[in-house]
Amino acid sequence: MDKRIYLCLAHMSGKEQGFIKEAFDTNWVVPLGPNVNAFEDELKHFVGQDKEVVALSAGTAAIHLGLIQLGVGAGDEVICQSFTFCASANPVAYQGAKPVFIDSEEDTWNMDPVLLEEAIKDRIAKTGKKPKAILPVHLYGMPARIDEICAIAAKYEIPVLEDAAEALGSEFKGQKCGTFGTFGVLSFNGNKMITTSGGGALIVPDESAKKQTMFYATQAREPFPHYQHEKIGYNYRMSNICAGIGRGQMTVLDEHIAHHRHVHALYENAFEGVDGITLKSNPDGRFNANYWLSTILIDPVKTGTNYDEVRRKLDERGIETRPLWKPMHLQPVYATNPCYVNGVSERLFNMGLCIPAGPWVTDEDVAYIVEQIKACCKG
């Protein structure tokens, strides 16, 4: 194959330039304006549950502002999912707080509710106080066991900040991911379900929380004619130009989600019954992943190879793949942080690959990818 097949490239609707041109024509090129307002309204309608949405410069910024509004500060602990990208945990450190890492369960690869409750009890026993927040992730678009996580959080009266950066459009029991916690986080990075070039959003419970989020995202400027600041703020608002890209992307969001699910269904059919290669799929009917990235596990005993060897061979054949996230409790920067592990995320990390699933991936591409993966696993 002459072309290179990428994991998930941005796919434009063709309407983005019109919204951007409108911003230039009206000179709305700042971090506010009609595109920002409209993009937030469209996201609010999409996620539902009577939530409000604030468009921001990144998903990381959204996590940071969520933590601030939950009162997370120096000396606090926040329970975080270990099997994730570092941006899920780093904002905890921004606040001078300590991430406490929880391993995954097999069904969804997300935060294990059993370990979560064990960790809460243990942290209370060791520190004399509850963790300040719980930060689960919907990894690769697969919904976590969020009902169990939220039930445990409610039992101990700990708020949930839900990282749905990879899960725009994913659902658990028909409800959109990102709407279960006190706050929810979305990402519009260039490789996500939709993009604003860079960007993210914080899903908040009400208008009051939206105003508070916007306050902190706009350098915490007080309502005076002069510039007055009584709290530390941040430059986290999304520009009107980037929001214009987002508005164009919203017109094809449903198509993008449908395409990712279609590609996954093709993989599911192609890998069925293949010994040594396991495709990650919805555990049962409660889960409806967007399949932002499709993921496979390669059993080294049954295939005679390993994920990294397969990755290198696929790269030579024009197919981009990527190892699964290295768990946070294995990262040098968090080597001394408390962690509650069961071995699941380490095993997954040592066996797994992300494979192409984006809007540019065709049925023919999937057939070629599957053919090459099978060939790599036959030596």
Regions found by a protein language model. Name each.
Residues 84-89:
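Conserved coil-to-alpha-helix start sites within the AMP-binding
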Residues 96:
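Structured binding elements
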Residues 32-77, 91-93, 101-103, 126, ...:
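Phosphate-binding glycine-rich loop
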